[in-house]
Amino acid sequence: MEYDLTLFEKGLEELGIVLSDEQKKQFITYYEYLVEKNKVMNLTAITEYDEVILKHFLDSLSIVKVGCFDQKKLAGKSVIDIGTGAGFPGIPLKIAFPEMKITLLDSLNKRVNFLNEVIDMLSLKEVTAVHGRAEDYAKQKEYREKYDFCVSRAVANLSTLSEYCIPFVKEGGSFISYKSGKIDEELSQAGNAVKILGGKVQDVVKFPLMDTDMDRSFVVIRKLKPTAKKYPRKAGLPSKEPLA
């Protein structure tokens, strides 16, 4: 089937991202498989082609608007995507910037199986999908404070997400949270949690998502010092009792 790439290419141009024909084909293959598998398992509520292009693919890639996520300096950088779900933003980032090393973490095994199928189908290298909870993986030596970037589009308040994500980031690295446009109250509530976990809010980047009624905010948290060993707390606590 032929797909109109006009919208996708317009969005890529706005973001300053140049993809080869092969990379564009990988995105289309990913789209087709996502929609096919979504018929038998709950991966996404968004399945219409243009909507997936805008609200999944281009939204995932819009992280390049964040200053520290400079696409010219991503070679060899390590990224972990927490609560990746159907692979957003991790898979689009891996397709667009194949020189990055990416770990995709999700708590649902069938989603991880789907991600492994996508990785094989697209012949992606240096990307690993793992099944488990952030609270558990962040305690493991091979994951804790090992990543240049932690990213997440997961729906949770910023205090909770910070406890999930900041422990994975090495000193000098960044946790970048994909948030909706209205972030000010959540940001003020999370300030102390971010500090406790060894981070500092470095930047907030706000913009409208192209051709949609969506506003996107990126909260950029810089890791200044190691996270105390007691964090994250045991599974379930960060969401039930967010750090104040």
Where do the protein language model's features map onto the residues?
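Short alpha-helix immediately C-terminal to the canonical SAM-binding loop
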Residues: 111-113, 183, 187
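Helix-to-beta-strand junctions that scaffold the AdoMet/dcAdoMet cofactor pocket
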Residues: 97, 169-171
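Residue-level signal for inorganic ion chemistry
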Residues: 34, 93, 179, 221
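Short loop/edge segments at beta-strand edges and connector loops
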Residues: 47, 131-133, 203-205
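Conserved beta-strand signature within the Rossmann-like core of class I S-adenosyl-L-methionine
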Residues: 172-182
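Class I SAM-dependent transferase core
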Residues: 1-76, 80, 110-113, 117-127
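Conserved SAM/SAH cofactor-binding pocket of Class I
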Residues: 61-156, 162
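SAM/dcSAM-binding transferase cores
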Residues: 188-244
